[in-house]
């Protein structure tokens, strides 16, 4: 059952949470770590418990990397289609974890997969969100050459989410890779144009421009920090906030 969290009022009514496929690997070298799935399902359940509507987009990098095989000679479109299928596999695994916790969930795919997932339908997705179901958007945008980050921003705009929350391995956006540069400094707040001008690599250009053009706030945070997701949703200042206006 969705866990009830008392005494904390959500700042956002509807969010779009973007998880990388790599996040699902946990301590494994490949695939899906069931312990990570269960932990993420618990954190999402906490949000549902306080009345937050949750849309999810999960990458596929834990199962397939189209870009790497494309560099080795595979046709890019074929590689991207295979990557889309990987995101469907991750979506099904996440749905299973949520339902085992008695959290109703629905997987929608941008590629028609009758009998496996529902086909993506914006109006149907919004109806399910309004009913308290977690909606998992898979297969990216359904088109090659678009990343799952772009898909996350697109779906967030389509379902009229209040914010895109991008879960990463670090607690925000830095001036450089903090794993490689010990002097890298973290930003608490950035504008879309600053991200583009500084080439910070938060998301690809298409995703950032989508957010900028539709004034969709984006927050980057560390999913491995316990309670970070809930803290953001109730108004905490985790990670880095990217939005329009002055930094």
Swiss-Prot record:
GO terms for molecular function: ATP binding; UMP kinase activity. Inhibited by UTP. It catalyses: UMP + ATP = UDP + ADP. This is Uridylate kinase. The gene is pyrH. Catalyzes the reversible phosphorylation of UMP to UDP. It comes from Pseudomonas putida (strain ATCC 47054 / DSM 6125 / CFBP 8728 / NCIMB 11950 / KT2440). It comes from the Bacteria. One of its GO terms (biological process) is 'de novo' CTP biosynthetic process. It holds the Pfam family AA_kinase. One of its GO terms (cellular component) is cytosol. Keywords: ATP-binding, Cytoplasm, Kinase, Nucleotide-binding, Pyrimidine biosynthesis, Transferase.
